Amino acid sequence: MEQEEPCEAKETASSSIEPKTPNPNVPDSIPAIDSDSSLSEEEIVTEKDRGIVTLSPLCKQRIDSASISDCVLVSDDEIIESLYQNLLRVILSLQQIQSVAVVPEIWCFDGCKTPPPSSRNLDSNMVSDTCPGAPMKLTKISRNIDSGLRRKLF
């Protein structure tokens, strides 16, 4: 019996391993890169004739010498720097998305934070939660000091 290799790619007549070019007239095709509004033109460099798609700005310098079929040696420092830049870009975009989703907070010039409008109620029950009470005067501790000693001290 012939054993099949589990990791071996099998070609069938109906499916192709080659990537397909998106067709804007066909609704089920892959959307074009230009239609993706989350990425700017600076972040995407495409050259359809050579099959190059680059997201990292550090890779733009290698766009003339690199393509999908070519093997290019890259130093470890360049790889780490590229990973760092890409991760930083992802983190900043996620923070930007989260900051848009959160209710904007109002800050005054001296750094004090104003509560958001949803938590500000004019109800008298809420006053104790939002406003601190007046400071309490400490009670004087009464001491019984002998009047003769008091005259000497004061």
UniProtKB/Swiss-Prot annotation:
Gene Ontology molecular functions: protein kinase inhibitor activity
Keyword Lyase: no
Compositionally biased spans, kind Low complexity: 27-38
InterPro entries registered for this protein in UniProt: SMR11/SMR16 (IPR038971)
Cell cycle recorded as keyword: yes
Lineage top rank: taxon: Eukaryota
Range of residues in the leader sequence: none
Region (Disordered) location: 1-44
Keywords: Cell cycle, Protein kinase inhibitor
Known partners and oligomeric status: Interacts with CYCB2-4.
Role of this protein: Probable cyclin-dependent protein kinase (CDK) inhibitor that functions as a repressor of mitosis in the endoreduplication cell cycle.
Protein name: Cyclin-dependent protein kinase inhibitor SMR11
Protein species of origin: Arabidopsis thaliana
Native organism taxonomy: Eukaryota, Viridiplantae, Streptophyta, Embryophyta, Tracheophyta
